[in-house]
Structures are given as C-alpha cells and as structure tokens.
Amino acid sequence: VDNKLNNLILVLNCGSSSIKFAILDPKNEKKYLSGIVECLFLSETYIKWCCLEKKYYKKIGSNMNHEDALNFIIDEVLLKQKNIFNNIIGIGHRVVHGGNEIKKSSLINDYVITCIKKYICFAPLHNPANLIGIQTVIKKYPILSDKNVAVFDTSFYQNMPESSFLYAIPYNFYKKYQIRRYGAHGISHKYVSYKISVILNKKFDSLNLITCHLGNGCSIAAICNGVCVDTSMGLTPLEGLVMGTRSGDIDPAIIFFMYKQLNMSIDEIEMILNKKSGLLGLSGVSSDFRYFEKQYHLTEKAKRSVQVFCHRLSKYIASYMSLMENRLDAVIFTGGIGENVSLIRELVFSKLFLLGFKINSKLNCSTVGGKSGLITESSSHPVFVIATDEELAIAKETIKIINKK
C-alpha cells in the first residue's frame, strides 16, 4: 500500500438484494478496495471483492439480510485492511429517494433519516435497504457518526420544470401527497454529464445532453444548459423504458383489467410489473442482456424482446430532442447495457437516421468493456459511450459535504 493513504471515503450502495462497497480516494480517483455481496435472502449469499489488485470470492451463508452482510463486510473484509480502513474520513451512502424535501446531498442527521423513512412508499425496494446501511454503519463505527453523507438519486432532478414533473391527474394529488415525477439514477446521469463536459471542453452549465443509463434498471434524462429538464422514471423507478424485470410505460388501465377481470391482488400486480415484466416478461427466459446478445439472431423471443426495448428507447431519444433548444452537444450511453452492448446502440440509432444520427460501425463495436469514446460519424450528432462510476461520484459528493462542515 502506498504511504499517501489519507482522506479515504467508504461508499455503500445497499440495493434490494445486494450491497456494493468501495473505499476510494476521491481526489486521485483510486479505488483501494471494492466489492459486492449478492443474493441476499436467497439460499446462497456470496461476496466478491478486490483489494490492491487481488480478487477474492466467498460464500458467506444462506438467507442473509442486509445487517448480517454489512457486519460481515466490516468485520471480515474492511477491518482486515487496517492501513486502508484507518484512513477513512467519511462514509457516503447512496439513497434512492429523497422526495420533495431533500434537494441535495446531505450530512445524515435525524431529519434526513426521517425523510428517508417518509419516502419508503415511493421506493419500497431501496429506501429500507439504504436506511439499514446507514443505521448499521453508524452503530458499528460511532467515531464517524457525524461524517455519514446521504447522496440522493433524486436530487439531480430537483430543478425540473413543472411541465415535466407534474402528472395530468387532479392537482391536489401533488399538493397534498407530493405525487410527481422524481426520477432515479441521478448520480449516474450527473457523473457522465460532468465527464462529457471535460471531453468536449465545455462548461457544464452550457451543455445540452441526452443521457441514457441502461442496466437492470434503465432511464434517460434530458439536460439543458446543465439542468435536467426531464427524465423517464417517475414517482417510482417503474416508469419509462423497458428494463430487466420492470415494465416501464404501460396503459394504467392494464392494472384495472388485471384486478377486475383477472382477479389478481394489488400485491400480485405490483410484483408482476416490478419483478416479472420487462425483458424477462417479454422473453419468458431471462433479464440478463448477455442472453439477448447471444440469442438475438437465433430465437424469435430474444429478437422480439430486444426490438421492444429499442423501439421504446429510440422513441424517448427522439422526443427528448424537442427539449434541446436548437442544439444537441451529445447523446451518452452508460450503465451495464449502455457500455457493453453495441447491438443496442446500432439498432436504436438506425431508427434515428432522420434526426441526424449515423453510427460508425467500427467504433461502435470496439467501444465495449468499460471503454469510453465517440461512436458516430463526423456528419452525425455526437454519441458517446461513457463508463459510469457511481461509487466515485458518491465519494466526491461525500468529501465535498464533509469539507463544508
């Protein structure tokens, strides 16, 4: 380990069935340790981590919950790396929903915790996990209890105009219950937007961008003069694009039909739209894009699923062009699918030729596996692939907030 280890940040991202963790230096952008616990609540929970170029893998039990897994991470992984662990000066937590109240990254106090609890109803899979992460770490590591920062996925969208965030339902639902578009993946959309400002050598607040975060969850954002003006996810992360297991946009009356005609319960319907739909629902086989890439030319169900996915995405890109005020600086693809699946980019932009997009096939095929770069011809609107790094983004926000104290 080099001797310049100081001012490190521990980043925690507690998902519904996984926990990602990393220790990094936000200044030199170096990751000293990173890992993931996967398959919580299932028969085999396991952990993979990487420390100083060495990789580790371990099965750690069955039916583990978030608290068990966090205790394992801290006791068995982090504390074994004393010289790294002892230089942590702050902890950054990804929190999915801050609702209408929390506009930006915040030091965690009782008020912030109350807000995270309050908005569990809008992020039932994520906010409870985020909360357990925060509470466990504060309990395990009281010396840093006032150095925990919540970085919200919703804060990037707090300046959207009413025309974007209001739903056309009685206005009272917004005034009384805060029902509106909130968006998600804000940390990733913001990170790649800042990255492109460096690549293009333009001020962030002069940029017009369309950013596409495509992973197991998928969302798209329109950014005008550095401000997000629209995004595809809504009150919850269920709206918008086709996703791994989520439906994205549907006619709301489908829900009434399932309830009344098919006698399904609300819980069943919610589970179907969140866990059994999207690519998994369309194909009946998988939500993993590696399957679709292999099978696209071989099976009808894979082709069908990918075509629905691309149809929806190209429609959103086309509609967001209308928000660009006469200039588009770049379209960005990021996330596991956005960065790695050249097929999707090819299919999506072949539909957008009329709007001035032309993919360079060679660049498109070679820009995968964490590589970033331009994938279009010089005559086209620029499309870039940019590898996202949510952990680094959270670490940078965390140190900024801690230094403000």
Give the ranges of each region predicted by the language model.
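Short glycine-rich, Thr/Ser-proximal phosphate-binding strand/loop in the N-terminal lobe
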Residues: S18-N63
